[in-house]
């Protein structure tokens, strides 16, 4: 049994990205583990939490699929998909989820997204999370450009993205499909030199 634990430890360290976990003042953005299922599902079933996300509210099976994909992505090399748990640094309590996906490797471009459980809205955690993702993208992955999509009605996210220095580049008409309707999205982006100039 001891050899198996050593092998598993070596394997995990081989796949662990040097940019992870991401530290912010109050949070850790870390890789998901299987034991996070109940904490993720608790918030992912909430229609208010998933109102502006691409999917949700989740069924049990949806959360299982999400976590399975997140765990599988951790072992792909080169790694291009970072779906991460947002947890309190002090006690590892899960507040939500975030992600950074390298969507255009040749152009060094990535896409970020996030959601937080309702009890944690209005405390600056979303801004802290996005700042952490930008650090991972620009410093850890050496990306040139990071984008985000945002529903025009999602005033909180618009405020958050603009606060971290992302600029609105346009309105994508009928870009996504949810609740049986095609919906417009705002496109936000930030370049590496803009992030550096803003003092990270």
Question: In which residue ranges do the predicted regions lie?
Answer:
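Acyl-donor (CoA/ACP) binding surface of acyl/acetyltransferases
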Residues: 1-51, 68, 83-200
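Short histidine-centered catalytic/ligand-binding loop motif
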Residues: 52-57
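Active-site rim helix/loop that mediates acceptor-substrate recognition in acyltransferases
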Residues: 59-80
């Amino acid at each position: 049994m001891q050899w198996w634990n050593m092998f598993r430890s070596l394997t995990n360290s081989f796949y662990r990205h040097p940019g992870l976990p991401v530290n912010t003042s109050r949070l850790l953005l870390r890789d998901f583990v299987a034991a996070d299922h109940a904490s993720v599902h608790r918030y992912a079933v909430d229609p208010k939490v998933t109102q502006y996300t691409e999917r949700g509210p989740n069924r049990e099976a949806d959360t299982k699929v999400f976590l399975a994909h997140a765990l599988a992505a951790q072992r792909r090399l080169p790694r291009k998909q970072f779906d991460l748990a947002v947890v309190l640094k002090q006690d590892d309590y899960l507040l939500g989820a975030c992600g950074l996906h390298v969507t255009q490797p040749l152009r060094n471009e990535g896409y970020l997204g996030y959601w937080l459980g309702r009890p944690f809205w209005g405390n600056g955690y979303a801004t802290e999370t996005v700042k952490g993702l930008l650090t991972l993208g620009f410093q850890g992955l050496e990306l040139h450009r990071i984008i985000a999509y945002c529903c025009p009605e999602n005033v909180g996210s618009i405020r958050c993205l603009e606060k971290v220095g992302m600029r609105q580049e346009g309105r994508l008409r009928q870009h996504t499909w949810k609740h049986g309707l095609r919906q417009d999205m705002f496109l936000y982006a930030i370049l590496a030199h803009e992030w550096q100039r803003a003092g990270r």
